Amino acid sequence: MSKIIELPDILANQIAAGEVVERPSSVVKELVENAIDAGSSQITIEVEESGLKKIQITDNGEGMTSEDAVLSLRRHATSKIKSQSDLFRIRTLGFRGEALPSIASISLMTIKTATEQGKQGTLLVAKGGNIEKQEVVSSPRGTKILVENLFFNTPARLKYMKSLQSELAHIIDIVNRLSLAHPEVAFTLINDGKEMTKTSGTGDLRQAIAGIYGLNTAKKMIEISNADLDFEISGYVSLPELTRANRNYITLLINGRYIKNFLLNRSILDGYGSKLMVGRFPIAVIDIQIDPYLADVNVHPTKQEVRISKERELMSLISTAISESLKQYDLIPDALENLAKTSTRSVDKPIQTSFSLKQPGLYYDRAKNDFFIGADTVSEPIANFTNLDKSDGSVDNDVKNSVNQGATQSPNIKYASRDQADSENFIHSQDYLSSKQSLNKLVEKLDSEESSTFPELEFFGQMHGTYLFAQGNGGLYIIDQHAAQERVKYEYYREKIGEVDNSLQQLLVPFLFEFSSSDFLQLQEKMSLLQDVGIFLEPYGNNTFILREHPIWMKEEEVESGIYEMCDMLLLTNEVSVKKYRAELAIMMSCKRSIKANHTLDDYSARHLLDQLAQCKNPYNCPHGRPVLVNFTKADMEKMFKRIQENHTSLRDLGKY
């Protein structure tokens, strides 16, 4: 008897499912992509228990005949390709013919479908890949696929599932990516009867961005475009002031397919040059139209990894598109920015209207670079965003519509902005630390610091608005003013955050913090870490938290940016301990809130900074390890000016004169 046997189709499909179906979000991705390939304009995704109990995809696509419905459950049966040459010019999202039979082999699947030409529809019920029921039914044009009890016959896979909120966050992320890739399709995502995501399907990408990431984010996105003989690039990227703590908000699309590509991500950052803070990443949605012959999507069953010919040329095209678009906007030069810091002023905050982005009546006007509400949506006019009062960030009392369903906007509530609170308090540091390994080492190093004597310094000057000059018994001292203030602020924040207790300051005007659906769910799951540092956020409608009081160690003017920074850090470091979280938070806050280079300090401010530095436990290094000051002794100065020389014998003594 031969040792090598041909595996049964069911077993082969279950093996394939190990690659195709990693988690419930994989099922959503494959089925929604099939719906898009079928020409659907409306797709509804309904899940229960984050997809483990139920996933139902309903579309209004072209549907399937009874014969095609049966064939669709067979391995490598597809309508997308018919010959070998088709494999090199793929324009559809699916083509392998593996997804549907793989999903059916590990679940209870029900398919209800009908074509426009067909007089009747077809109902198929399959369990573990075997068709148990087939009958003729009445059905509208389109397809409805119901997947129940996922992994029922492969229970080992369930051990690797994360929490329900985590799995739901993955589903939301997939739906968001597909919504950005296909703004012409109206997507609706419902979890346990609650609507999570809804897009209008108007075909406007910027409107889709507003529906997913929020209106404030969409208004800070700039359009990019570029093209050559091989590639055509279009999309939106965020202004340098709008960043996130990770790359998860970068969406790359090739011919409508969401992909992951490290080099193309790198080209996006290169397009910003030095405009981004180290450790921060932009929001970007970039669609790349490419000849299918130049892209090989048949690399992995998930089809998220794509090999691209002329990849270097494409990288250059993306970088150029971003840099050229940024040049068209008034990004304030450092000199003017520092000049503005001589006077204390508050930064105007973008105003959030009280209209829910989840409703389909929101439209984007390219000519005016603004959003508006369709006449068929409301009966009375709503004030233009730019005409709203910006003095206190409050919303006009006449606006009646609620930002979130079930939550009424109060004139005494501010919408928090991710804008940096005051340009004087932020620094574009090249030494920002985000690596977990480096952070661990740094925490140990900072914890082991010991107090040391610091010389008495007498300030007498400043150079280039960057370095302070002082003298002491040890000679001349040159101090890096940014590093000095960074050290002072780090020790302040480390001490204050370490003293977190129940002492809270009531906010006169509460703040609202808006997040994407996936971030909102993850923050809810990790809320205890925020509470450990004295931040108590309460859910307030869809994807929104309200902050009614802040910890006393955080200044009120730092609340908006500080809360967003802590949430970003929490999302970036999934299982971080409170100790590491506080250390990283203190490093980050001290870095961003220290004075920049080319900032002139008056005598009082300079002396006060040196006095504060003298009180630090370690005044010699900033939190990143760079030196705060250097010393030139009197002997060093005399050597440089050749004042220390060997004894000379005079020429007169030698009898020359």
From Swiss-Prot:
Biological process (GO), any one: mismatch repair
Alphabetical keyword list: DNA damage, DNA repair
PROSITE patterns membership: DNA_MISMATCH_REPAIR_1 (PS00058)
Domain of life according to the entry: Bacteria
Gene Ontology MF: a single term: mismatched DNA binding
Pfam family name, one: DNA_mis_repair
GO cellular component: mismatch repair complex
Keyword DNA repair: yes
Keyword Transmembrane helix set for record: no
CDD domains the UniProt entry points to: HATPase_MutL-MLH-PMS-like, MutL_Trans
Function: This protein is involved in the repair of mismatches in DNA. It is required for dam-dependent methyl-directed DNA mismatch repair. May act as a 'molecular matchmaker', a protein that promotes the formation of a stable complex between two or more DNA-binding proteins in an ATP-dependent manner without itself being part of a final effector complex.
Family from the record: Belongs to the DNA mismatch repair MutL/HexB family.
Name listed for the protein in its UniProt record: DNA mismatch repair protein MutL
Species the sequence originates in: Streptococcus agalactiae serotype III (strain NEM316)
Taxonomic path: Bacteria, Bacillati, Bacillota, Bacilli, Lactobacillales
